[in-house]
Amino acid sequence: MADEQLNEKDLNVEETGAGNAADTRVLELEEQLAAAKDQALRAVADLQNVRRRAEQDVEKAHKFALEKFSSDLLPVIDSLELALAHSSADDEHVKQIREGVELTLKMFQDTLKRYNLEAVDPHGQPFNPEHHQAMAMQENAEVEPNSVLNVFQKGYLLNGRLLRPAMVVVSKAPSAAQPSINEKA
């Protein structure tokens, strides 16, 4: 009977040892499983981020593919507008040419609008350094300081991105008259 009790104790110790080893192994495997799940989730998230970035890059490429082409066309628009500004609508000799230039300019502008190219003509608006380039400052008491008085050249935006800034003259407050030498004395 003593031998049977010893064998049972040995079996219990072996089972307990085997149970602890199995529990330890189960915990290790659960940790490995959790780590593998975490890696899989990260891989899926990384893949989604790469796809999203690629889609954004393609969208930007489509959106701004016309940037260089549009920049090259802006001097043509400027020339047509300048031709209209320097021709008289009353002169019979250039009336038909002027009408042709007006129609050409209108078709050109309509086409550019279809491709989201919009003019920045800030006459009378507050100066915005993000869209305007100040070419000169001029004193003027009739308008608010830092207002656009004159536009030398229109600016343009392509899909909301600045393609060319508007070149403008900006108002400044009149300076106070300097007292003369006689007034100082």
Swiss-Prot record:
A Pfam family hit: GrpE
Listed GO biological process terms: protein folding
Protein's cellular compartments: Cytoplasm
InterPro entries: GrpE, GrpE_coiled_coil, GrpE_head
Residue spans of biased composition, Basic and acidic residues class: 1-12
Presence of keyword Repeat: no
PROSITE patterns noted in UniProt: GRPE (PS01071)
Main location (coarse class): cytoplasm
Keywords, comma-separated and alphabetical: Chaperone, Cytoplasm, Stress response
UniProt-listed Gene3D superfamilies: 3.90.20.20, Head domain of nucleotide exchange factor GrpE
Coiled-coil segments on the chain, per record: none
PANTHER family: GRPE PROTEIN, GRPE PROTEIN HOMOLOG, MITOCHONDRIAL
Sequence similarity: Belongs to the GrpE family.
Stated role: Participates actively in the response to hyperosmotic and heat shock by preventing the aggregation of stress-denatured proteins, in association with DnaK and GrpE. It is the nucleotide exchange factor for DnaK and may function as a thermosensor. Unfolded proteins bind initially to DnaJ; upon interaction with the DnaJ-bound protein, DnaK hydrolyzes its bound ATP, resulting in the formation of a stable complex. GrpE releases ADP from DnaK; ATP binding to DnaK triggers the release of the substrate protein, thus completing the reaction cycle.
Subunit structure as annotated in this protein's UniProt entry: Homodimer.
Protein name: Protein GrpE
Organism lineage string: Bacteria, Pseudomonadati, Pseudomonadota, Gammaproteobacteria, Pseudomonadales
The gene coding this protein: grpE
